[in-house]
Amino acid sequence: MTQNTFMEQALINAFKGLDLGEVPVGCVIVNQDNKIISQSYNKVIADNDPTAHAEINAIRQACVSLKSERLIDCSIYVTLEPCIMCAAAISKSKLKRLYYGADDMNFGSINGGFNFFQTKNCNHVPEIYDSISKIQCENLINDFFKGKRP
């Protein structure tokens, strides 16, 4: 499977969230054998939980699946640049690689004005790859917010 294949699955998850009225962000975590071990989408409204972002949900599932708080040889694919909370969870879980689609210039933790991974308190920095399926990811999030804020 390729980076684009995993991002396509993350996009499918984002659309599931969109169907429920959530901000459409989807996520997939794969192990070292490139097998999907968890996937999710934003469930903030559904769970009445401001921390129920796609990345947090998928990290929790992956940790349970692997019976470990560390995801050392795993990669995470997410349709939108992670926020600071999600970046901290990515760091704490020791994910090896982060792939994301669209930049988030408002709340992003990498290109959005504050790079969490460059702070002195960040104890693990994943390999970071941006702009995976960028156009599709940007269109999805931009169309959602155009509908909310005309």
What are these regions (language model features)?
Residues N48-T51, I56, R60-S91:
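Helix-adjacent hinge/juxtasegments
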Residues A10, A14-G17, C27, S38, ...:
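Small-residue (primarily alanine) positions within well-ordered alpha-helices
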Residues M1-L20, I36, E69, P82-P150:
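Zinc-dependent deaminase
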Residues I37-I45:
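Short beta->alpha transition motifs characteristic of CBS
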Residues V44, V78, A102:
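Residues that line or immediately flank small-molecule/substrate-binding pockets and catalytic motifs
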Residues V25-N34:
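Short beta-strand scaffold segments in enzyme catalytic cores
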Residues T2, V23-G26, C74:
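Short loop/turn microsegments at loop-to-beta-strand junctions
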